[in-house]
Amino acid sequence: MDMTPTDPTTGSADRQAPPDGTIGLRESSDGRVRLYASSFADLMEMRAPAAVVGAYLDRHEGWFRRCAAPMAVEPLGANGYVLTLGRFGNFGFEVEPTVGLELLPQQEGIYRIQTVPVPDADAALAALYDVDFNASLRLDQADAGPDRGLISAEEVDRLMAHTLVRWELDLSVWIRLPAMITILPDPLVQTSGDHLLRQIVRQISRKLTWKVQEDFHASHGIPCPPRRRARF
């Protein structure tokens, strides 16, 4: 699929390179370049000790590709993936951002996902958009406590050792807009783009956390707890 949009002012594909051929969109002084950013936080309850949840997350080559669907995922090295986030655009201008991600090894119960370069990336697309994807999963184990022997049978399942996985995602997208869009009121262009990105971040996070939670419990033969409301 050709993701290079047409510039309404010229009728041709907008393939303008950065001003000096090397400066990326993040450092560009081009007035058409817009930054849209959004954050999201959520919580997954896993009915297993943190060590079991950690062992599952360590094997990301299985769960990440399964749970990221329907987003397109391709492997990138030993710990990375190329992820297509879905369509993002404003006022008829659309791109389908693709980003390289690296899943870093656990450090003190925290897993981090960071942006890495995509090899052989299309230079024309790199002149249109840039993505910074930073996420973390923190494992917090909650135990039944010292009075477990005093609880009723009905409470055992509720109070069994379980782990809370706290998910946070910060996503920033830089886009070089067609000149036609920049004649619109500045606040309108910014707020509409921010709103759309919030929807995308929310959708990515909700689907990913739900699927990881369901996949973990299914793979361990454990009943999956009900979904929690998202924390925005």
Predicted stretch roles:
Residues 2-5, 71, 132, 146, ...:
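N-terminal intrinsically disordered, cationic/polar leader segments
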Residues 42, 46-48, 87-91, 103-109, ...:
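Beta-strand elements of well-folded, non-transmembrane domains
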Residues 76-78, 94-98, 106-110, 128-134:
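Short connector loops at helix/strand junctions that flank enzyme active sites
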Residues 73-79, 104-108, 143, 156-161:
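Short, ordered beta-strand-loop transition motifs
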Residues 2-96, 102:
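Hydrophobic ligand-binding cavity/cleft-lining segments
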Residues 125-194:
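Beta-strand/loop substructures that line and gate deep hydrophobic ligand-binding cavities in soluble
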Residues 39, 66, 83, 96, ...:
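Extended beta-sheet lipid-handling architectures
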Residues 184-231:
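A conserved amphipathic terminal alpha-helix motif
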